[in-house]
Amino acid sequence: MRVATLSIALLSSMALMPMKTQAKIYAYPRADEVIITSGTKTTRTALDPNSIKILNWNMYKGSNSSWENDFKSLTKDVDIALLQEAYLDKKMTRVFREHPTMRLEMATSFILASRGYVPSGTAIGSDVKMTDLGYRISEPREPVIRTPKAVTYAKFAIEGHKEELLTITIHAINFVSSKKLMVQLNDIAKVVRAHKGPVVWAGDFNTWSKKKLRVMHELMAKLELTEAPFGPGRMKVFGNVIDFVFYKGLELRDSYVLPEVQGADHKPMVVEFYLP
């Protein structure tokens, strides 16, 4: 999302369309087609506990001209990439497929039928084999266009540790009340509560109101997840930050934003963790 006003204008224009016209714009995958796999075979079976480097980035569908080069550069030096607004048009499909080190798994939120049936969703990439992979489709839908948001999650083994790392990438439902946002967040919280081990939950939470920020932070506190601190540069809507990284069961070594990267409207965020 570039700015809120553009998205609101889109919703307004959609509201004027007949329902049959809107139905032709979006399609939805069968359950066995939600996950789309790209990239290469993984080269490692476990994360190095001395350094676990994770990228969080809403890629704005790869629309900006420098996205491809930025994506290749950013993913070269991280263990895990937690991605939002993955958009498997010809360009992004090629870039994902040709990635030299990462295997990428995308959970499809919806398919843009009007643009040649292009799947869009959230994705996790890594050169480490995933021990588990799953997704959640939001029960709440965006108003008017009636599209859901998919959350992707994956687990990774850690060398010398019995417990695995759970990673979650979210692109939260947007033009809804804080109550409907909480429906989506609480659904994902079930995955967190069921996991015994360290957790990283990151993404675009679409917390563009104070109330949404409050309910998100209240839930993270209940889950005993800590917010990673970042300097200036994160995406804001109506003056409120919407991109976050939360974690538990890990030691934080570093966290920073890369404001100079122009590959998307959101700025990439990088965190590095370790386990003693």
Outline where the language-model segments fall:
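Positively charged n-region of N-terminal signal peptides that target proteins for export
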Residues: 1-5
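Bacterial N-terminal signal peptides
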Residues: 7-15
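Metal-dependent phosphoester-hydrolase catalytic domains
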Residues: 22-42, 155, 192-197, 206-276
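Structured beta-strand-rich core segments of catalytic domains in phosphoester-bond hydrolases
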Residues: 24-41, 80, 84-164, 259
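Boundary/entry segment of secreted carbohydrate-active catalytic domains
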Residues: 28-66
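Acidic/histidine-rich helix-loop elements
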Residues: 51-67, 110-114, 141-145, 174-177
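Active-site beta-strand/loop signature of hydrolases that rely on acidic residues for catalysis
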Residues: 52-59, 71-95, 166-170, 184, ...
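Active-site-proximal beta-strand/loop segments in catalytic clefts of secreted hydrolases
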Residues: 57-60, 83-86, 107-111, 127-128, ...
